[in-house]
């Protein structure tokens, strides 16, 4: 997920000037929601990981050192791809040409690029509908080089199939993001649905039984007769896709579906925040950092990533404004003037500024509770180990970093790379505490990699099941 920088509307002569009370209210609301997400998500993360370990399940979706090294690069590619997607064609090509000039590409190649841009975007400034770029590109291919069958198929597709433009792609992307967010909210709501259906009277008996379901796509690793794959050994098959759910998941999702419909129709800030908070809590719970070293590397990499894309370019803010989906938290600054339903001038905080520090703080929560113990800790007498409070201290550090971010944002009235302030607070404070307590080695070497879902660990689990 590309993260959006925290921002407020720029100052301009025709822009409403908000009072200190209005700005403070919106900032405190975002401040409270972000901290709530981190605390709840971290608590749920410790429970989730401990449950998986107790049931001898390997943890999927872990971020190890390998993933941490690649994450800033892959995130940059996704972010830049979205940026190019939102840019008009002419601006997109001119931007590429400027990059070539910065990279000191020979002038003759730059001139060829410019001539190509002028040729292919010549009609994009007219008032009438512009001809699709791919059609203009295809028209430049000599017809004698294209087989007649391909020409006929292309002509039929162009005249009969609906045209998929940027707007349609944006609608699909928005729907997918909103659906996943509502699904996350349903997961948070499920315990309450379960308690209601199990304990309340007059509930039909078929609803009291929580039937589990498994939807999967399995591939064989060798040739088999039809029907043999179902009974094949585990090592002879692999899952291409697998999702397990139960009846209460479906009921919770149906109960949350009005939020999805409402947000798709109205894009209100309340439904946006319901989806965004759910995304953040479940993301912190399920995105698993495998070790403190991996978490440190991830934070340092995204520290420079955030600075570059916010301060160095307009990419981050352009993508944040271009995606009309709940990828950030919002709270209106004009809520006192226009009311809850009509307020429309928002302060914003990107979900990445919550989830990225949040998964690191969740790791510290698991370190405090010794979810994974060393050999010495496992042999120590009950109650002899001293308590840890890295989680609480780092939450306070995050609060301080976020406060600094918002203060700088309001002072300069411009978008700020929040991780510039959050990463030093969340990384150096627990390290300093570990030095003071003499636990630097234990913290730095804290590792949950043996519970990560990979080939080596799967073999160990399978051999353990055979021995039992």
Curated annotation (Swiss-Prot):
EC number: 3.4.23.-
Motif PAL mapped to chain: 417-419
Main localization (coarse): membrane
Keywords, in A-Z order: Endoplasmic reticulum, Glycoprotein, Hydrolase, Membrane, Protease, Transmembrane, Transmembrane helix
Record: active site: 306, 353
Lumenal side: 1-22, 92-168, 266-267, 318-343, 410-415
Enzyme class, spelled out: hydrolase
Cytoplasmic-side segments: 44-70, 190-247, 285-296, 365-388, 437-468
Effect on the protein of changing residue 417 to L: Embryonic or larval lethality. The few surviving adults are uncoordinated and have severely reduced fertility
Glycosylation sites: 14, 114, 123
Membrane association type: Multi-pass membrane protein
Domain remarks in the Swiss-Prot or TrEMBL record: The PAL motif is required for normal active site conformation.
Protein name in UniProt: Intramembrane protease 2
Taxonomic source organism: Caenorhabditis elegans
Underlying gene: imp-2
